[in-house]
């Protein structure tokens, strides 16, 4: 649905409906569960992200951790501290896959482990929650989609913007036509500190005794133990996907969700470089990408910067206004897309022609008696609950129980990851790239 203009009353009614009963929003709530509905999960990877997922998951009703696996022994201790002292822990993640009492896997492992983890989990009959980005490469993603579809198991990708209340409101407002014809979508995020640039301090006790370094490297060419690579793997393309896979994927996933897009971009062009963090990394710390999406070639411009602090934000532009989404706040700045006065070009008309034109213009465009004026002032609202990780994990565990679809399945996650891979490929190839659906490859 697309209206030519919206009055203030119409906008408030529509946005309230989109907000789900009130502009104030509603906090996330869980349904009551019987003890028989308890889901037992195995945790693979108890690092920075994994420890957070583990702690959040065990607080959800009807969810219990049956065991944890990590190649670094210090994280066995951490898992026991988070869950319980007698939690079974191991370096061998396959023990969790082989355990028939475990319903599903929550995995937070380096990107270069995602394909192996997903394929082996679903092949073992386990549903899996895999951290973003879904894949390390486009080819890995294709293989993962095939494996999940063949197995019939459930996969949820851990990019939580699709479970954000504020993104859901934006999605409904866009679907109702409040923005008119979409013209451009922008998204950005910036950080400006060592932690934000992944310069994490390696564990002081890291050694070949406390870490199975050889297995950690997976199928990447072997090298001697490097504690910085272990802690900062996101900085190297051999193990991670850089700002594209770690940060851009959130912007892309949220954009796909809000705009109702579930396909890879048609085209991508990137620029950037290592501008701030000259620490040996080979992934850019500044990365800007322009995409074209869909039949209308909608321009989408995304930029990431690890040298300047900027809040994560979207600016969705249309013929009837601009919608800005940041954190738990949404702001709509309406535009009529129409002249408010007769065109100043008529000043070049002779007097009689100008007077006649302007009289006719006012007759056709001035508000009539009883007609509501269009919305002109900016309107904002916020939600009180912005912890989108909880509902995202809850959606996964509910799907494990009920076998209903998840909000971010393997196809959605693959398409979001492809946008990130295209951003990286365009950057490293220094040319525009396209997605070739026939060969399922990125071409330039």
List the predicted regions and their residue ranges.
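N-terminal Rossmann-like dinucleotide-binding module
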Residues: 15-83, 164, 174, 255
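Beta-strand-loop-alpha-helix segment that lines the small-molecule cofactor/substrate pocket
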Residues: 115-163, 177, 430
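N-terminal Rossmann-like NAD(P) cofactor-binding module of classical short-chain dehydrogenase/reductase
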Residues: 105-106
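Glycine-centered tight turns that cap/initiate beta-strands
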Residues: 62, 86, 101, 178-181, ...
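N-terminal glycine-rich "phosphate-gripper" loop used for MgATP/nucleotide binding
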Residues: 109-112
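Contiguous beta-strand/loop segments that form the cofactor/metal-binding neighborhood of enzyme cores
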Residues: 169, 178-181, 186-188, 194-411, ...
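Conserved SAM-binding strand-loop segment of SAM-dependent methyltransferases
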Residues: 87-92
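N-terminal secretory signal peptides and thylakoid transit peptides that target proteins
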Residues: 1-19
